[in-house]
Regions:
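OB-fold (S1/OB) nucleic-acid-binding surfaces
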Residues: 595-615
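Substrate-binding/charge-relay-adjacent region of secreted/lumenal peptidase catalytic domains
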Residues: 2-98, 106, 111-402, 435-487, ...
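Short nucleic-acid-contacting surface segments enriched for D/E, G, S/T with interspersed K/R
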Residues: 619-635
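An often Trp-containing, charged/polar helix-loop segment at the C-terminal end
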Residues: 406, 451-454, 502-551
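A recurrent domain-boundary module in secreted/ectodomain proteins
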Residues: 549-572
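Structural detector for short beta-strands of small beta-barrel domains
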Residues: 577-597
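Polar, glycine-rich mid-to-C-terminal structural blocks
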Residues: 397, 401-436
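OB-fold/S1-family single-stranded nucleic acid-binding modules
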Residues: 640-655
Length: 655
């Protein structure tokens, strides 16, 4: 129903001030803000493929879309875009862009005009950021405006925002899904801390210990996307190209003998590559780790702002690039923010979370694998107190969450690996726990995800999914070495590099990864970490590292070559007999159900005279033994339509 002014309340747009925030007064009516308006898909569009679809369609058999195909099937109706554009112009706002694939209308306007257009009261709010500053590595990059705070002292942040709902006129009520940019509070914190007591390894050394596959030919076809964030009010972040060159080609980094990646800078929401701020170290770390793990791959660096509009526009830009831009095959995100400030106090509005999550779902349709660091604040996600939290976007089921480990006692290919846990305000702890925003996905049902440690002990998506080295790299920044840079943001770009390598070997994109990772047939691909450590942090109750999946290291660290082999189209010998008839051939792939149990053949090419045998000619009658995995023989019984009796087929790995 419309409200008194004839406007409709936009559901899921509710904002509340952060705990302890103080409203300083109205926002400057002449300040210009960017906004993004998202619209519905064109009427009659099919539903996006869901997780069950991708679980039943294994890598190698997935059909991805072109930009034109996606726009035609799932894009916005041009009439809807024009309707919103007309509203923008009528209200004295400036129309910046419309994009049918992203389903967005981007505009800008003064605070006065925006307040009237969307029936909100924009104000200036002051809030504390009490955990970022102590965990920030104080390096040569520290040039933040204003007086520097002491360790442990609260840092005041002022932002433009509002409380309550966004409102839209009646004619847009069934067209507009969200309006973003009217609230500019912070929604991104980098996952990176100093830890000066560990002798760091290099990214190539870690890749070797994790048995990453060799660099295949044609890696120039692979593109890794990195999302980087800065303060929309005054902050900047970026990298110096000379630092990247030095890291790969000189003893300051891992050189000589390595090649610096090709880089493309893509600015979003007014941000750009502008080094000189406190977050430069994160940008340098992401580029140098991803580039070292996947030599020859191109890297897109997406610079954006750390508010809701910056998140939405950056993720949409990566998934739906402009003409001439490379679409990444892998996306790595080393930034996050707690789902909730307190229980019931949603930090991300549902509209923002839905918009970002839907775009990650769209990424699967282009074969994009998305990784996100689980954060460096243990079970607290950076929120002090007696309540556990997890961060977003790592809690999104369309994202592979990456926790942290520590590697020691290295001797050749042998090493010890434990949960990355430390104590004290200057150190870090691998993030992980149970989501408050997302239900337990079906692909985690058989992995003993514990209930939340919070009162009520609800069930939800467990994070992280996997874990990797977080115990310190030496990187190059501003022409000098910066040692001991640690955090789960080391692990996310490392695994982005691994998937780029695997894509290069396969000659096709792996795409959405989570249901595949949790398949029983892939469990030999992980190094389980069960050291009994707990990720409690900042007063929040924690979770313990135990055998199997846990909320510290997920399934464990990844054995790169084993994962490649598991994702390949396995060349399997097939031996079958029925009466006097026998034949031998190859199976290109196997079908597993959502719980990892063998269901049948994806494709089979069987040789023996002129005999052909494929998945359409038989149906599985019985499964004998467990699902196929490396070094395991599985016998299944199938029925040939031409045979009166079942045919027994034994599969053995001969790859």
């Amino acid at each position: 129903m419309p409200e008194a002014n004839g406007y409709y309340r936009l559901e899921n747009s509710f904002h509340q001030a952060p705990p302890g925030a103080k409203k300083l007064g109205p926002a400057d009516p002449n300040e210009v803000l960017p906004v993004t308006i998202t619209v519905r898909r064109r009427p009659g569009s099919p539903s996006l493929p869901d997780q069950e679809h991708w679980a039943s369609t294994p890598p190698g058999e997935r059909q991805f879309l072109s930009s034109d195909e996606f726009e035609e099937r799932y894009g916005a109706d041009p009439g809807d875009l024009e309707l919103v554009a007309s509203f923008v112009r009528e209200r004295g706002l400036t129309l910046v862009d419309t994009n049918p694939s992203q389903r967005t209308v981007v505009a800008s306007g003064t605070v006065a005009n925006l307040s009237k257009a969307f029936s909100v009261e924009l104000g200036r709010y002051e809030t504390d950021d009490i955990v970022e500053k102590p965990r920030r590595p104080i390096r040569v990059a520290e040039k933040a405006p204003g007086k520097q705070k002491k360790q442990g002292e609260a840092e005041k942040t002022v932002y433009v925002g509002f409380e309550g709902y966004v409102h839209i006129p009646e004619r847009l009520a069934n067209v507009v899904e969200g309006v973003f940019g009217l609230d500019r509070r912070r929604l991104a914190r980098r996952a990176m801390v100093p830890f000066p007591t560990i002798t760091p390894l290099t990214p190539p050394q870690v890749a070797k210990l994790y048995d990453f596959p060799a660099t295949p030919p044609h890696m120039h076809k692979e593109t890794i996307g990195l999302l980087e964030f800065s303060n929309p009010m005054f902050g900047t972040c970026g990298y110096y190209p000379g630092d990247v060159t030095s890291f790969f080609t000189t003893p300051l980094g891992i050189g000589p003998g390595y090649t610096a990646p090709g880089l493309t800078d893509i600015g979003v929401n007014g941000a750009s590559n502008a080094p000189g701020g406190p977050d430069d170290i994160e940008v340098a770390l992401d580029i140098q780790v991803a580039g070292a793990a996947a030599q020859g791959a191109h890297i897109n660096v997406y610079f954006t702002t750390w508010d809701e509009n910056g998140w939405i526009l950056a993720v949409k830009r990566a998934v739906h690039p402009k003409p001439g831009e490379r679409r990444p095959s892998v996306l790595s995100i080393s930034w996050a923010w707690s789902e909730f400030d307190t229980i019931g106090g949603l930090t991300w509005t549902k509209a923002v979370m839905d918009a970002v999550s839907t775009t990650f779902q769209e990424a699967a349709m282009f074969g994009i694998t998305v990784f996100a660091a689980s954060g460096d604040y243990g079970s607290s996600a950076g929120i002090p107190g007696a309540t556990a939290h997890v961060a977003y976007p790592e809690s999104d089921p369309w994202v592979t969450s990456v926790g942290g480990t520590t590697i020691g006692n290295v001797s050749g290919s042998s090493f010890t690996e434990v949960t990355w846990v430390a104590s004290g305000v200057e150190f870090g702890t691998t993030g992980g726990g149970v989501s408050d925003a997302f239900h337990l996905p079906f692909w985690q049902h058989h992995h003993n995800i514990p209930p939340s440690v919070n009162p009520g002990h609800h069930r939800g998506r467990g994070v992280p999914d996997i874990a990797g080295y977080a115990s310190g790299y030496t990187i190059v920044y501003s022409g000098a070495q910066v040692p001991d840079v640690q955090g789960t943001s080391e692990a996310a770009p490392l695994y982005a590099g691994l998937i780029a390598l695997i894509n290069g070997h396969l000659g096709e994109r792996v795409g959405y990864l989570n249901p595949t990772l949790y398949s029983h047939r892939l469990q030999h691909c992980f190094r389980d970490i069960a050291d009994g450590r707990n990720n409690s942090d900042l007063g929040a109750p924690g979770y313990t590292s135990v055998p199997g999946w846990d909320a510290c290291t997920g399934l464990g660290s990844v054995k790169g070559h084993a994962l490649l082999k598991a994702l390949e189209h396995h060349l399997l010998a097939v031996h079958a007999g029925h009466g006097e008839e026998s034949f031998t051939g190859k199976v290109a792939g196997l079908v597993f159900d959502r719980f990892g149990e063998f269901e049948g053949f994806l494709l089979a090419e069987v040789h023996g005279g002129e005999r052909k045998f494929d998945s359409r000619e038989k149906e599985v009658q019985q499964v004998v033994g467990r699902a196929w995995s490396e070094h395991v023989t599985t016998t299944v019984t199938v029925r040939d339509k031409e045979a009166r009796e079942p045919v027994s087929i034994t599969l053995r790995d001969h790859s």
